[in-house]
């Protein structure tokens, strides 16, 4: 019995050796058909793309022996997203995700891990509000040299369940109350709906329904509460960020003036002389020709009307800040006298001490000659740093120095595009020498174009022709 067990123990190592030899022969011997898998070139450790870009990977799989059918399985964040040999994955979600490729051929299985970093798509660049096929769209145009890509419409892509049918009414960019989260506001239709979007993902956060037609939507000069200023049927309203109801500012203005108002689609803030605080902002009442003021950080009382009686019978063409926002400039039209006028104004200083109050003063005024090119349809933008007033006529751009004492231009500074194009909006980028100009062609499928003009060198930096629908407004996110 003991001998029997000894023979058995001695036989076990021989059986094991024989078993190992069979695996080795079958895998690597000349007559074996098992084929090991590998990649001819390693995958990247991490792939970085913008949201909505497509991750494309085409691995070259090598087999050691028989060329068998290879199965593929691509995983992103633990989910199988493709079983094709080449990966084409649309990066819909923002963030960093673990990824894995599994390849198998029946004999061998290999795993290859890599990372995917999806960045925000919409950062520095222009946001272009336009109409296209009966709907409001917002096109994103990144800065020159950016790795980001142009997108014709960021609204529908990121909010597929929302119907943006209707005319575009207004757009602007602001930081949320945390001073970090970027927000984009867009007004659509009549009666108008104001949408608040997350500026990074372009997902809708809040909607506000107005009772009338929004014709103006811009970031308010108010520091508290942080808000948007909007004109609803030419009456000013305040929309506090991330809230859904409009506060009518027109009631108190109407009570202060003693009559109805019809405000122009413009507002301009001014600062005290040391530039530390924003004293207030002004609007213009086209109903009777009045410069309407609202308090921001002034410690004293700001009159509801500045320079009473000075602008009777006039309507606003455009306004803006000069002297680094210490003063303002107005361009007006008087239909009775058929005259355009330019006013250079100090809006006043309103501290709590009555003896230190400085009333508003017209520092200079001049009749704008017919040869200067100004029209009632001119788009007007003002450089607070350069004291230059830029205004349009068709596709022509004019420039007037407020400090020149009435020395208006006799010819256009430059023109944009073809003769049939019309300047729809302009934007001066704060702290830079860039003037962005948006034009619309008379006809075509995509009529909207964008031009970038150097205000220092007075030359065109670049042009993007016919890239979007009919443009209403533009804004910039920095």
Q: How would you label these PLM feature ranges?
A:
Residues 48-65:
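A short beta-strand segment in extracellular, disulfide-stabilized domains
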Residues 115-145:
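An edge-strand/N-cap motif at the start of beta-rich repeat modules
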Residues 439-478:
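Blade-level signature of beta-propeller repeat domains, shared across WD40, Kelch, NHL, RCC1
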Residues 201-395:
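Acidic, serine/threonine- and glycine-rich low-complexity intrinsically disordered segments
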Residues 1-49, 106-120, 126:
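Bacterial Sec-dependent N-terminal signal peptides
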Residues 100-101:
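Hydrophobic/tyrosine-rich beta-strand signature of extracellular beta-sandwich/beta-rich modules
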Residues 73-91:
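Surface-exposed, flexible coil segments in extracellular/virion-facing regions
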Residues 63-73:
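Solvent-exposed loop segments of extracellular immunoglobulin-like
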